[in-house]
Amino acid sequence: MKNLYKWPAAQSLYPNQGKKSYAGKRFRYRLRSWLHHSKIKQFEQFVTQNPQLIPLLNARPNYSYPVAHRFLDKRFSAKQRLQKITDNLLFLPQKLAHLPPLWEQAVNFGEIIADFELWLNINEHQPMEGFWALELRHRPTNQLVYLLTFGKLDEALLIAVIQGPNFEGSKELVKQLTKSCHGLRPAYLMVETMKALTAVLGYQSLLGIPQKYQNKSAGCKVSAM
């Protein structure tokens, strides 16, 4: 039922696609779920107490997986990870309580540079890199060009990963963007934008994660959507 939450089945995350089998991924998911059974039960109780999250978690089964795997920083223990996950699922919706949930409607900040729009959205790629994202999109094509995922760490915000483009024509698009920014590289533009968002949300500090501790997915470049 849509108004109930239950820990996702492996098949909902990793269904076979044609002749391609994901049996290995399903096995690892089940094993991790078994190893983290107590944390999963705590997470289910948390969701029951915060039913506004059920539509997001039911629609995106991979948003639950970080409880049993990784989230933001590889150095987190299972206990720390669960605490960070519950905190991160709540803080931004609470800050934006006057708006529809981001999983229903992303926030368009408009053009920050000619032909390039900035969006605040859920992370539609890999939630272990953070549940929330700043997206830089090429307005004429609606192409995602740069993605910055972030979360909350205690009383600071945390940049998890910044991902650049990997689609046909992306190099020329990045050159156009860099020129429009008077030589400022797009990754630095994303950081500066995140600094501004940090201040607007009422936080004093913006942190980063050393690269070797980032939960960067294997296919981390932004592809054509």
UniProtKB/Swiss-Prot annotation:
It comes from Mannheimia haemolytica (Pasteurella haemolytica). Keywords: Cell membrane, Membrane. To H.influenzae HI_1119. PANTHER family: HOMOLOG OF VIRK. The gene is lapB. It is found in: Cell membrane. Its main location: membrane. Pfam families: DUF535. GO terms for cellular component: plasma membrane. One of its GO terms (biological process) is DNA damage response. This is Membrane protein LapB. The keyword Acyltransferase does not apply. InterPro entries: DUF535.
